[in-house]
UniProtKB/Swiss-Prot annotation:
Keywords attached to this entry: Cytoplasm, Elongation factor, Protein biosynthesis
Cellular component terms per the entry's GO annotation: cytoplasm
Family affiliation: Belongs to the EF-Ts family.
Protein name stated in the entry: Elongation factor Ts
Organism: Ureaplasma urealyticum serovar 10 (strain ATCC 33699 / Western)
Gene3D superfamilies, alphabetized: 1.10.286.20, DNA helicase RuvA subunit, C-terminal domain, Elongation factor Ts, dimerisation domain
Length: 291
């Protein structure tokens, strides 16, 4: 096999990064079995250095058990590892531990995974896989006897949402709302919880737009309020048009089912993290061969 083919096979078998596979093969005279041993022996030493890297890929997962719904994000560096069974097992382990032990948002940082604090629990997997593996964040919603929880995780594990409503409703109803939330990604549940700093910035943008458009000052205030209301409706879950029945808002859809939304969170993998430019497999091999 060519060096590139050896690298690809070693990466497939070990889930190690491209650069680590090349180093392992170089140190093992291109013997794959010896390279696997080299990776295992050297992984732990290099894991700490991997933690300095940016982990912008990964998964978001949501699940409910009893009166509790949990939403988490666990990160790695590439979509290749995000699909790895060991990585997915680790992420699901965190999810199950959170469902069993988390009672408030602060409890996520107190979780113990495989005998280690959650902040350190990804180190062994980082050593084995060769990419930074880290728990990034989590949210919890809890229901009382007169409330219902809804959860949704998209089938690619890249977006997920949890929702809490007042009222006892069918699971399908709250799952539909959670699915809508995961797809549309509204910033807020309703206008009452809108970040006023964000709202002020949106207003400032509109004012600057009107200046460039040369709109008459007499109409400026009305135009500003109109555009701001439109932005609020687009960014508040309860005011959005329900994607399965666009003639209804989410608020109206829930009202028709005797429910009111009172809690909501959604995650998208890597949101807010600066991402490095992506390379193809061939380009990545070529770049590593030049080192």
């Amino acid at each position: 096999m060519t060096k590139a083919e050896l690298v690809k096979e070693l990466r497939t078998r070990t889930q190690a990064s491209m650069s680590e596979c090349i180093k392992a093969l170089d140190a093992s005279e291109n013997d794959i079995e010896k390279a696997i041993i080299w990776l295992r022996e050297n992984g732990a030493i290099k894991a700490a250095n991997k933690l300095k890297n940016a982990a912008t890929d990964g998964v978001t997962l949501a699940k409910k058990v009893g009166n509790k719904a949990i939403l988490i994000e666990v990160n790695c560096q590439t979509d290749f590892v995000a699909k790895n069974e060991n990585f997915l097992a680790y992420a699901n382990q965190i999810l199950e531990e959170a469902l069993a032990k988390v009672e408030s948002k602060e409890d996520f940082d107190k979780l113990i995974i495989n005998g280690k604090p959650i902040a350190e629990s990804g180190l062994d997997l980082t050593a084995y896989i060769g990419e930074k593996i880290v728990f990034r964040r989590g949210e919890i919603l809890k229901a009382n006897d007169q409330q219902t929880l809804g959860v949704y995780t998209h089938n690619n594990n890249r977006v997920a949402a949890i929702i809490l409503v007042d009222g006892k409703v069918e699971d399908e109803v709250v799952r539909n709302v959670a699915m809508h939330a995961a797809a549309m990604r509204p910033r807020y549940l309703n206008e009452q919880v809108v970040d006023q700093v964000w709202l002020a910035k949106e207003r400032e943008i509109i004012v600057n737009q009107l200046e460039h458009e040369g709109k008459p000052a007499a109409f400026a205030a009305k135009i500003i309020e109109g555009r701001l209301n439109k932005i609020l409706k687009e960014n508040c879950l309860v005011d959005q048009s329900y994607f399965k029945q666009p003639e209804l808002t989410i608020e109206k859809y829930l009202k028709n089912n005797n429910a009111v939304a009172v809690g909501y969170y959604s995650y998208e993998v890597g949101e807010g993290i600066e991402k490095a430019p992506q390379m193809s497999f061939a380009d990545e091999v070529a770049a590593q061969m030049k080192k």
